[in-house]
Curated annotation (Swiss-Prot):
One of its GO terms (biological process) is proteolysis. Belongs to the peptidase M36 family. It comes from Arthroderma benhamiae (strain ATCC MYA-4681 / CBS 112371) (Trichophyton mentagrophytes). Gene3D superfamilies: 3.10.170.10, Neutral Protease Domain 2. This is Probable extracellular metalloproteinase 1. CDD domains: M36. The gene is MEP1. GO terms for molecular function: metalloendopeptidase activity; zinc ion binding.
Amino acid sequence: MHGLLLAAGLLSLPLHVLAHPQPSTSTSLAGRAGAVDLNEFRVAHRSSYTSHDEMKKLPSIASFRQGTYLEVATELVKQTMPNMEFRLVDDHYVGDSGIGHVRFRQTMHGIDIDNSDFNVNVGKDGKVLSHGNSFYTGPAPSSNPMVKRDFIDPMQALHGVRKALNLPIKADGAHVEDMSEHKVMFKGTSGALSDPTAKLCYMAKEDGSLALTWRVETDIGDNWLLSYMDAKESSKVHNVVDYVAHATFQVYKWGLADPTEGKREILTNPWNLKTSPLTWLSDGQNNYTATRGNNAIAQYNPDGGSDYENNYRPSPKNLKFEYPYSPDMNPPKTYIDASVTELFYTSNVCHDLYYMLGFNEKAGNFQVNNRGQGGKGNDFVILNAQDGSGTNNANFATPPDGQPGRMRAYIWTRANPPRDASFEAGTIIHEYTHGLSNRLCGGPANSRCLNAIESGGMGEGWGDFYATAVRLKPNDTRKTNYVKGGWVNNSPKGVRMYPYSTDMNVNPLVYTSNNKLNEVHAIGTVWCTMLYEVLWNLIDKHGKNDGPVPIFENGVPNDGKYLAMKIVMDGMAIQPCNPNFVQARDAILDADMNLTKGANKCEIWKGFAKRGLGVGAKFDPKNRTGSTQVPNECK
């Protein structure tokens, strides 16, 4: 689950319901009594990444060019992994930076190896820019399991997962319905928000072996789990992935992180017709007078349930979403109209800005109607204001493209009166960015690629980075420090270990700090600290656009702030599945190489090197090696 604060017992899943957290050691599943520590089930880092610089050392491959970007990518996989069985994943696209993103899934006996992926990035020149690889290279099973079918049935797998993870699901009397050759749905269960499913697949294990598993998918609200149950032993769980992110609007305007930074304004038609041509109040088939449209649907959810369609949402006369609010109002339900409106506004602006930076239909964004622009539709973001399923947190669930994302914004009880997460834009941007990073890393069809401890940490760090970049003010300099979640948590220190700062005395975090950290939000603070250094290096070089949208020149933002946001986003789509810091750094460098021909190479290197991720830094999950060195041309 991806959340702002570590909800009691939740902060450990291979992240996909993402929360918005402060340092915590609590890692149990959704805080239930008897819950297990999901860190035990995280996937291991297995990916390699061949950067653009490394590709140049392989001329026979780097210079390969033939036909479409799909053909180029397919040929690369064939050359790199000869005699391997694989399939093309149907989520390939050419991004707005001109890079063709193609992903392949390894198979064995026609069965997916669910954590074995190969992603190829083809540049505008038709040549391979870079690629990532986590294909399994160990011994293959001697026989096809579908011949003897000597594995447990899917119902046994569901019961095994329920027992092993202490899930609140009842399956007595349930039955199985076939969905495809290797996938079934369980009908007649209770305790889940949708019917659980199970898919037969392999999992490449950390010890180099291969396990046949049932991938059991259960959406229980605060957690949306993919649990890989051994297909021979119904008590053995190998890994767990969690997906758990003419009208007027009276709101805190974009750029204000929380109510302490300004006053509410009445904005008219605040959407951007280039990125939301249907406006925020239509999906092209229906026009709405409530907080519902193509990109999002926002409502009051006091019981924390899943029946969002029938929940209350403001529907004002004449489309005037203008409601009273002040932080002193109490109880929170008295200002629910303002809360839902604010949540709807901030999330829609996120959609529009991220669209401009490259998170569009082809890349797997969140929209009901994709208007023939690619990708899968029917997946707006479900926005639950004052969600009753928890307090002192927020989270975002990111299933694959074509299924709605889900954000839950909670009431925070750290102040009197309580504070509503909907009014802290930094929290909402952080959560929405979980949807961005999970759809880009691994491709729109695979939301399982930020599940290792370091990649999960980067998922949290990206959320903080975009929230911090958006809140920069005109007079800010590299000496400006920002805390995360200060208002909602009623704490001047916020919810992170340190403020985001370029001053090593204020924030001393470096790459090797991760050697002592085992929690994703803490690791994410290290990653965002590095990105904050890169951000200011680029601002110092290119200046800062304080407007709400980037200005592009030949496809490149003409200022340092939006340029940093752009290349970081492009890097997400380039990097391999479950990347580590070193690989993600290289992907950002490759993104800049593609976008600007490497014009900002030294600014990027210096930002990372200052925090120990320079030339020579090496990833080892137990003993990372730091480096402050930069390439010779940057000295």
